[in-house]
Amino acid sequence: LREGKRALLLVEHFSNMDLPALCYLLDHCGKDFGPELSKRIVAIAGMKLNEANPMVKAWAEGFTRIVIYPSRSLASITDPAELEKESAKSRAINMASMRALDRCKKEGNAVLVFPSGTRYRPGVPETREGLREIDSYLRLFDVMLLVSTNGNCLRINPDAPEDMLADLVYEDVVIMSASPVLNCKEFRAQAMAEAPEDMEDKKPFVVAK
């Protein structure tokens, strides 16, 4: 960032405490660069955080973020009229988010993305898989950090998985580990080269790497 490079953080997503925990660790354990990086993080957030509940929205607004309309949200709509309406809404929101994303990069911020686009749910392995849109982020940024998380103190309530206010608080140790700084272009090129030659759409393969 100090050299003017566009930086991307790809972070595992287990709970709504992931971003606060990362910022806390950067502020308190990040040596000379941590507090500066913490202040420069802009998170990509699904609109669910804005619409699920006023309390959830208020809590989310404590962090700088860009709101998007996730593509997987359209997949569950079966009514044609509703799909057309939501598709138009999706395009408007995501066009605005792309302009905001471009502005953030130019201002020297680090953009944080949760590759799965949702919190991981035990027993639902697809919630841990990266979305194919992550390939587009790799093409938009110069360098990236991959951040893994072990431990979770705010867990999804199995009896109310869609209600964020019903999340269960646990005492736990949360350890976040970061990769070395990776060159996005080189990473993507290597992944593309490793993909099977007969694979038509290589984006999911790149994201899975």
Regions found by a protein language model. Give the residues of each.
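Conserved acidic residues
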Residues: R6-A7, D142
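A Trp-anchored, charged/polar loop motif used as the substrate-binding/catalytic surface
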Residues: K89-R103, R128
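Secondary-structure boundary elements
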Residues: H28-L37, A96, D102-A110, R139-L140
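Catalytic core of membrane glycerolipid acyltransferases/transacylases, capturing the structured
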Residues: A7-E86
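A cross-family acyltransferase "interaction/gating" segment
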Residues: A58, E107-E197
